[in-house]
Design a protein with these regions (language model features):
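Amphipathic, hydrophobic secondary-structure cores in small proteins
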Residues: 51-52
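An amphipathic, aromatic/His-enriched active-site/gating alpha helix that lines ligand/cofactor pockets
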Residues: 30-36, 55-88
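Glycine-rich beta-strand-turn "strand-cap" elements at beta-sheet edges
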Residues: 2, 40-48, 75-97
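Short, surface-exposed ligand-recognition loops at beta-strand->loop->(often short) alpha-helix junctions
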Residues: 9-17
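Short, acidic/polar
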Residues: 20
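Active-site-flanking beta-strand signature of metal-NTP-handling nucleotidyl enzymes
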Residues: 2-8
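Short, glycine- and small/hydrophobic-rich beta-strand elements in well-ordered beta-sheets
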Residues: 26-48
């Protein structure tokens, strides 16, 4: 299993623009055979922070997700609003592969 959290600090006022596109990307991603979970959350402590929690059956399934045109377009769109970006792999001790 390949599970991770992405935390994105955004330029002020960018959150709504990203959320407008995020729902469609979420729908498409959840339909991928290798996707186990694809969720995003607004941060209650910081209105300019967006958090994604994603889980794929494998690192390869995530790589395939990254090759999808809708994924590339969504990333290219929201990157222009980044102030910070953190990617953290998460899991239990027995999921370190």
């Amino acid at each position: 299993m390949y599970k991770f959290v992405i935390s994105i600090g955004l330029k002020p006022g960018a959150l709504e623009q990203i959320l407008q596109r995020a729902l469609e990307v979420q729908r498409l991603t959840r339909a991928e055979a290798g996707c186990l979970a694809y969720d995003f959350f607004t941060c209650t402590d910081d209105p300019d922070r967006l958090v994604f929690i994603e889980c794929f059956v494998s690192k390869e399934a995530h790589a395939l997700h990254c090759e999808q045109q809708y994924t590339k377009e969504f990333i290219a769109f929201h990157e222009q609003f980044h102030v910070s970006f953190t990617f953290e792999r998460i899991g239990t001790d027995n999921s370190r592969h």
